[in-house]
Amino acid sequence: VADSLGIRVFFIKGPASVLQGLRQAKLSADVDVFVDPARLDELLQALRERGWHDRPVDPDSRTFPKHSVTVHHSEWPCCIDVHFRFPGMEKPPRVCFESLWVNTETIALAGQQMRIPARELGVLFLALHALREPLLPACRQELDYLGELARREGLSEGLLGLAGTTDALAAVRPFLEDLLPKTTSFVWPEASVEWRNRVASHEPGSARVLAILHATWRVKPRMLWGALFPPPEVFLGTNIYADMSMAGRLRQHRARWARFLRAMPRLVRDLRGLKSSGD
């Protein structure tokens, strides 16, 4: 579809990363594609004309700043995540895409020529993705795997350069700092509020609590109401087949509150730790 319209796209993560040796074999539940932000709407419209539908998303963009649009099709077993930016890369989307595009290459996959990130950029994408939840065993394992690969192939300088051109230095610091020579003298920038909140959101509800704490008093009441009584899109975004009858919604509200209350002690601990690190 993108080729027929002359729209620049490249595929991230997924089977291509496995073929490159950047990731251990795993089953992909969706397809991740990065599109030229200037032509995002054009690509989405073309997909909709071919039977793809936007997946419901939480309308609270303050808590969950959008970085992609997910579409699904009744005749396809997977979704497509159409990225127009990538969390951790703070450069303006259109400028960032140009830096990314010059670091892509073409491979043959499933009988098609596909554009994918070059090796260093592929590592950067995977590392940033894993750093969103670095305490999860699977993410920790992926970071260790990528670290060993980067050391073995001497990718640290290339990664440092890419992180600099995409303004990802602050986000990727925990991964990259261990790869650089101890003699390297470097001033690391501060991570954005969005990235700090994303990484700190370990427990159910923590992202909303953090967003409300950082919001202005003018919008706090509206955000609090949305957290207490979320719209149907919140449930459908997690499970597109969720029961939206009155009884079904009540069950989901009850389960949501139960998860939040169980996580409350850990949430308070994480908030205290975040406050201490910011002092």
Residue ranges and their predicted role:
Residues 1-29, 35-279:
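Conserved NTP-donor binding/palm subdomain of two-metal-ion nucleotidyltransferases/polymerases, i.e.
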